[in-house]
């Protein structure tokens, strides 16, 4: 797998590199933030719970310091120059609730006031296979959290990304393949049993995110837009709904443990695809825009549905109209 130490390091005293990461306080996002910080980035961690993010920041600071000392001691030799205490970035918290579009706009506005450019936007946050629920904005909760809120967040921050020819990395999932034919996003799959049809809702949201990435690459060719499947990361809060179910929760816990043992990757390994897309200098808008990467940063191909440009355009148009109907101009 990719060793992130071979990727470029920046000196924040010389060059101010800015990254924005949604859901950066746990799991894959935590390690994405850690490595961006080690590489000299000013990182804005966007999430709902200030206490959890403050705790995550302290843990990341401690882990980064530990890794810098290990690298200095030669106990953890890498292929690249390695991190340095003198070249670490900085970490900041932005309140972001993806189930509230007005909150999403406020978060973007705050960043617009704080910075004049963004080098990397990582749309990392998401939920998976939860019960059917509608948000206050009138969208199915998985669709809004995984796709629609990230759509409007990205569009609001786009001027800062275009200012420095930045990069947009959106975390999809291999689960998007469950959308085996194009479904209108207004379809909620309100059928029983939920434990079956919730996966179709999840697949729709992750397919839409890839389609959005494809359309961004077409509409804004000066920004590198990429989508990733991080790998089968089983040690994640995404599965908490299933493992906490009465009676059958223990069955799902055992199932996820077995799948993780044979096929899974760690949270840090799951962050590698995002890190490659964010930092690899060999990626360019000319040859890589709109591509899809999988575990460890390997280039791959997403589903037929997600690659269909006409259907991607339909998803884009539907999203813009839905947001305008709710008072959000795109």
From Swiss-Prot:
* Location within or outside the cell: Lipid droplet; Membrane
Give the EC number(s) under which this enzyme is classified.
Answer: 1.1.1.-
What is known about its processing and modification? N-glycosylated.
Any one cellular-component term (Gene Ontology): membrane
- Locate the residues binding NADP(+): 28, 97, 124, 202, 206, 233, 237
Q: InterPro entries per the record?
A: NAD(P)-bd_dom_sf, SDR_fam
Listed A to Z, the keywords are: Glycoprotein, Lipid droplet, Membrane, NADP, Oxidoreductase, Transmembrane, Transmembrane helix
Q: Which residues form the active site?
A: 172, 202, 206
Can you tell me which residues are glycosylated?
Answer: 282
Q: Kindly list the GO molecular function terms attached to this UniProt entry.
A: oxidoreductase activity
Q: What is its main location?
A: other
User: What biological process terms from GO does the record include?
Assistant: lipid droplet organization; vacuolar protein processing; vacuole organization
Transmembrane segment boundaries: 27-47, 245-265
Q: How does it sit in the membrane?
A: Multi-pass membrane protein
Q: Which family does it belong to?
A: Belongs to the short-chain dehydrogenases/reductases (SDR) family.
Additional free-text comment from the UniProt record: Present with 892 molecules/cell in log phase SD medium.
Q: Return the PANTHER family for the record.
A: RETINOL DEHYDROGENASE (PTHR24320), WW DOMAIN-CONTAINING OXIDOREDUCTASE (PTHR24320:SF282)
Q: What does this protein do?
A: Probable dehydrogenase required for replication of Brome mosaic virus. Involved in vacuolar processing and morphology.
Provide the protein name.
Probable oxidoreductase ENV9
Specify the species: Saccharomyces cerevisiae (strain ATCC 204508 / S288c) (Baker's yeast)
């Amino acid at each position: 797998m990719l060793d992130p130490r071979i990727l470029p390091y920046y000196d924040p005293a010389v060059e101010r590199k800015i990254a924005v990461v949604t859901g950066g306080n746990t799991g894959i996002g935590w390690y994405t933030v850690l490595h961006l910080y080690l590489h000299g980035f000013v990182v804005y961690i966007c999430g709902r719970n200030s206490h959890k993010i403050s705790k995550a920041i302290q843990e990341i600071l401690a882990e980064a310091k530990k890794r810098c000392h290990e690298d200095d001691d030669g106990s953890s030799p890498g292929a690249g120059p390695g991190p340095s205490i003198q070249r670490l970035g900085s970490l900041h918290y932005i309140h972001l609730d993806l189930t509230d579009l007005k909150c999403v706009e406020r978060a973007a506005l705050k960043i617009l006031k704080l910075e004049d450019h963004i080098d990397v936007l990582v749309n990392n946050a998401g939920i998976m296979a939860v019960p059917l629920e509608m948000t206050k904005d009138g969208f199915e909760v998985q669709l809004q959290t995984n796709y629609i809120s990230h759509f409007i967040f990205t569009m609001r921050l786009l001027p800062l990304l275009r200012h420095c020819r930045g990069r947009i990395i959106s975390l999809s999932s291999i689960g998007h393949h469950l959308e085996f034919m194009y479904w209108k996003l207004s379809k909620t799959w309100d059928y029983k049993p939920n434990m079956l049809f919730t996966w179709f809702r999840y697949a729709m949201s992750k397919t839409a995110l890839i389609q959005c990435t494809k359309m961004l690459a077409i509409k804004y060719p000066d920004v590198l837009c990429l989508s990733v499947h991080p790998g089968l990361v089983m040690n994640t809060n995404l599965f908490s709904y299933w493992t906490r179910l009465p009676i059958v929760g223990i069955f799902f816990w055992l199932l996820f443990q077995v799948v993780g043992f044979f096929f899974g990757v760690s949270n840090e390994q799951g962050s590698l695809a995002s890190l490659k897309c964010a930092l690899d200098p060999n990626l360019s808008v000319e040859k890589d825009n709109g591509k899809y990467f999988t575990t460890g940063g390997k280039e791959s191909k997403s589903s037929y549905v997600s690659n269909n440009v006409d259907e991607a355009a339909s998803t884009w148009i539907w999203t813009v109209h839905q947001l305008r109907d709710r008072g959000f101009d795109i």
